[in-house]
Amino acid sequence: MKRGKKYIQLKEKVDRTKAYTLGEAVGLAKATSYSKFDGTLEISTKINYKSLQNVRGTISLPHGTGKTIKVLVFCKGDKQNEAREAGADFVGDMDLIEKVSGGWTDFDACVATPDMMKEVGKLGPVLGRKGLMPKPKAGTVTTDVSKAVKELKAGRIEYRPDKGGVVHLGVGKCSFSDDKLSDNINAVVAALMKDKPSDAKGDYLKSFSVAATMGIGVKVDVKELVNANI
């Protein structure tokens, strides 16, 4: 793929052989963003563990993601009022089941009470492929819909590695201050290390980098980052 002159010029600002401190990396990633919009700062980290299917969890970012998260809640009765008061964008039971079964997915996160999961489970072909299926481990199958909605709205994100063992996450907008982005990244690393399987051997995080949506990847000193968050 041929790169433009601007990309090549920005790339020269980053020493590809160097692992930067977190503060340096965040500043460089923002400075080498070449989008005309307020891009997202994204992290990529390689997980060193044999059973990747068991590596997943949720992370609450202290400063949110900067995105407006639309939350749908499948629930009945009084729980519907509870969900609406917490800020849910779409609330319902069989009416929403029918709408989603038709392929509608104009929302970013989905919560369900346990008594709705028999019907919600049938939406696997629609919700599953978009990563929207509610799951107990992710805290999205719950009777406490108010807490779930508020956490999702505030920037709670779910993580899982891809087939290559790499976790990709957006951790805030490039317009965030460096300190806020660093706080969010430290929260990600702390959560990953807290969730580290007990039988994981060696360095659990093998590499770590940050980049804007349209920007240059910047390597972070992963050992320094991990040591600051354990």
Swiss-Prot record:
Binds directly to 23S rRNA. The L1 stalk is quite mobile in the ribosome, and is involved in E site tRNA release. Protein L1 is also a translational repressor protein, it controls the translation of the L11 operon by binding to its mRNA. Part of the 50S ribosomal subunit. GO terms for cellular component: large ribosomal subunit. It holds the Pfam family Ribosomal_L1. SUPFAM superfamilies: Ribosomal protein L1. NCBIfam families: rplA_bact (TIGR01169). One of its GO terms (molecular function) is tRNA binding. CDD domains: Ribosomal_L1. One of its GO terms (biological process) is regulation of translation. Belongs to the universal ribosomal protein uL1 family. This is Large ribosomal subunit protein uL1. The keyword Ribosomal protein applies. Gene3D superfamilies: 3.30.190.20, 3.40.50.790. Keywords: Repressor, Ribonucleoprotein, Ribosomal protein, RNA-binding, rRNA-binding, Translation regulation, tRNA-binding.
